[in-house]
Swiss-Prot record:
Keywords: Copper, Membrane, Mitochondrion, Mitochondrion inner membrane, Transit peptide, Transmembrane, Transmembrane helix. Belongs to the COX11/CtaG family. Interacts with CNNM4/ACDP4. Interacts with RANBP2. InterPro entries: CtaG/Cox11_dom_sf, Cyt_c_oxidase_assmbl_CtaG. The keyword Cytoplasm does not apply. Coiled coil: none annotated. One of its GO terms (molecular function) is copper ion binding. Residues 29-90 are mitochondrial matrix. Residues 110-282 are mitochondrial intermembrane. The chain crosses the membrane at residues 91-109. It is found in: Mitochondrion inner membrane. This is Cytochrome c oxidase assembly protein COX11, mitochondrial. Exerts its effect at some terminal stage of cytochrome c oxidase synthesis, probably by being involved in the insertion of the copper B into subunit I.
Amino acid sequence: MGGLWRPAWRRVVFCGWSWSHLGRPTRAAERAEPCLRPGRSGPAGTEQGLRRLGTWRRPSPAEQPARRPKSTNPYTRSQEEDWRRRNKTVLTYMAAAAVGMLGASYAAVPLYRLYCQTTGLGGSAVAGHASDQIENMVPVKDRIIKITFNADVHASLQWNFRPQQTEIYVVPGETALAFYKAKNPTDKPVIGISTYNVVPFEAGQYFNKIQCFCFEEQRLNPQEEVDMPVFFYIDPEFAEDPRMVNVDLITLSYTFFEAKEGHTLPVPGYNSNQQLSPASNL
């Protein structure tokens, strides 16, 4: 602390005891003194005080604390390598799972629809029908059901698609006819193909379609507009199913997707291997 205090100007000796009084501290000492108090101890306070005194300097690289050397223990190195290998394996499995889930999301929709078409489960209407059965059906007049219609278009298809009627009323055992309208507002021919669904799901096994445009390629030229009929009936057994007691509303929903020319699909619900093609459009 040399140079921080002025020389003593008074010294008293009394009975072997000496006492001296220092002069006033210099300005440098006044600036550094708060940083060098015991309460300000530590690297930050000491460095700040030395900076104010002008005696601080940055430590050289040789004075820096030595970094921790890499472990030379063979066991530790093998353990670190094992951890890295495990991390790579986990990342590989995660990437494979993500790709698998993406592929399953694309494949699940058509497979699920084909399953529902064949079994009549999951809210899909049954496509199979027999002419004798239709002719011999007995309508259940006291069981009135409201049928509503919905239309959707996939983002890849630039069509205008809508039902021509919002609702109709039918009874089990009675045939009904409804229409949808589709238009191609683009300047090029577009081929579309549709799927359908029935809500509530439990009513799908009783919803029978005699004639419709589903699973068939529909080619529309630029600015062309067509009407698409749906001929269907509700099976009379609908009125005998206790699960359908509170079902008075059924919704038939169609969704159109863009299809490639020449694409064919098997007709669900039929025992034959008949396929639909553009020539069989309704």
